């Protein structure tokens, strides 16, 4: 039941719970100290969202939303890492999380578009239903990170 969930901006106090969720689906190569995490949470272009099960207070979803200022039109933006805990999937919660971000992008952050990269066919169906369209672009990356996980 969607009514028992809340989408809100994540805070520094959510960092370690969010990190565990993020590391379930993507490579995490470092654990930030609280001070390092606080610095990232202060970036004015980074807006982390979380989805909370209000019955138990547990964070069950995350999405990173980034604003990219543009000098000639409304801001561009990007959604990264829409993640829902495995046991909470297939309940419409990814949709709930994304709809809030889309609403905020339009009405709060003056964005003219949102981009995202998608690989999963399930996620493609979700994003298409939210009026995202495939554009013919190529992703190019210069990765200078060491993606070997560091032991804690």
UniProtKB/Swiss-Prot annotation:
Keyword Transferase belongs to the record: yes
Active site per the UniProt annotation: 127
Catalytic activity of the protein: an alkane-alpha,omega-diamine + acetyl-CoA = an N-acetylalkane-alpha,omega-diamine + CoA + H(+)
Recorded metabolic or biological pathway in which this protein acts: Amine and polyamine degradation; putrescine degradation; N-acetylputrescine from putrescine: step 1/1
Principal cellular location given in the protein's record: cytoplasm
Highest rank taxon of the organism: Eukaryota
Cellular compartments annotated: Cytoplasm
One of the protein's GO biological processes: spermidine acetylation
Domain N-acetyltransferase, chain residue ranges per copy: 5-152
Entry's Gene Ontology molecular function annotations: diamine N-acetyltransferase activity
Keywords for this protein: Acyltransferase, Cytoplasm, Transferase
Gene3D superfamilies per the UniProt record, alphabetical: 3.40.630.30
Transmembrane intervals: none
InterPro entries (UniProt xref): Acyl_CoA_acyltransferase, GNAT_dom, YpeA/RimI_acetyltransf
A Gene Ontology term for the protein's cellular component: cytoplasm
E.C. designation(s): 2.3.1.57
CDD domains, A to Z: NAT_SF
Class of the enzyme per the UniProt entry, highest EC level: transferase
Family the UniProt entry places it in: Belongs to the acetyltransferase family.
Subunit relationships: Homotetramer.
PANTHER family tied to this protein: ACETYLTRANSFERASE
Summary of the function given for this chain in its UniProt record: Enzyme which catalyzes the acetylation of polyamines. Displays higher substrate specificity for spermine than for spermidine. May function to acetylate host-derived polyamines, thus alleviating the necessity for de novo synthesis of these molecules.
Name of the molecule in the record: Diamine acetyltransferase
Source organism: Cryptosporidium parvum (strain Iowa II)
Gene of this entry: SSAT
């Amino acid at each position: 039941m969607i009514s028992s969930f809340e989408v809100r901006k994540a805070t520094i106090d959510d960092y370690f719970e969010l990190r565990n969720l993020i590391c379930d689906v993507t490579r995490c190569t470092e654990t930030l100290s609280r001070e390092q995490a606080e610095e990232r949470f202060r970036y004015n272009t980074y807006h982390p969202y979380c989805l909370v099960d209000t019955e138990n207070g547990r964070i069950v979803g995350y999405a990173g939303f980034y604003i990219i200022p543009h000098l000639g039109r409304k801001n561009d933006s990007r959604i990264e890492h829409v993640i829902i805990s495995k046991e909470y999937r297939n309940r419409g919660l990814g949709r709930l999380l994304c709809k809030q971000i889309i609403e905020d992008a339009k009405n709060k952050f003056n964005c003219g578009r949102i981009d995202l990269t998608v690989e999963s066919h399930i996620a493609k169906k979700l994003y298409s239903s939210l009026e995202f369209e495939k554009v013919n672009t190529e992703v190019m990356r210069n990765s200078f990170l060491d993606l070997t996980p560091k032991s804690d």
